């Protein structure tokens, strides 16, 4: 019963996965977000200044590609944490507000990042989605 209520209030957010961009779809609308994050080094603490978009001044930031074989420039930059924030950003952008009810997230085409994540893509995506606020997660 609770699943029916949650589905009516939030529905499913479908995320189509590719190394260069994720496509978030919900209730007939979709948004594409490139899979990189701009970080600014503030005396040893990194601040996220942009997700999936370049902006004026982004050239002075550290750009971290979430699904690149190239390692981030600093070992304190953790891609799983950035992936969680990336998914949270995408969920908020597609739903358009902070949802009272947490959505069900459905990932599609996860095989597109299998090589980069050595076959652990489903586990990585599921964990990131739950941490980003998903009620439940499915892999199609």
Name each model feature, range by range.
Residues 1-140:
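Nucleotide/phosphate-binding catalytic cleft detector across ATP-hydrolyzing
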């Amino acid at each position: 019963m609770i699943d029916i209520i949650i589905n009516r209030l939030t529905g499913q957010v479908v995320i189509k996965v590719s190394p260069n961009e994720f496509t978030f779809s919900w209730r007939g609308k979709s948004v594409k977000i490139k899979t990189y994050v701009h970080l600014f080094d503030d005396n040893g603490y990194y601040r996220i200044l942009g997700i999936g978009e370049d902006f004026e001044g982004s050239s002075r930031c550290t750009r971290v590609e979430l699904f690149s074989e190239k390692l981030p420039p600093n070992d304190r930059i953790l891609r799983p944490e950035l992936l969680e924030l990336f998914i949270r950003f995408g969920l908020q952008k597609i739903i358009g507000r902070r949802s009272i009810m947490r959505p069900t997230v459905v990932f599609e085409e996860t095989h597109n990042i299998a090589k980069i994540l050595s076959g652990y893509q489903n586990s990585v995506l599921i964990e990131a989605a739950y941490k980003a606020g998903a009620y439940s997660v499915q892999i199609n």
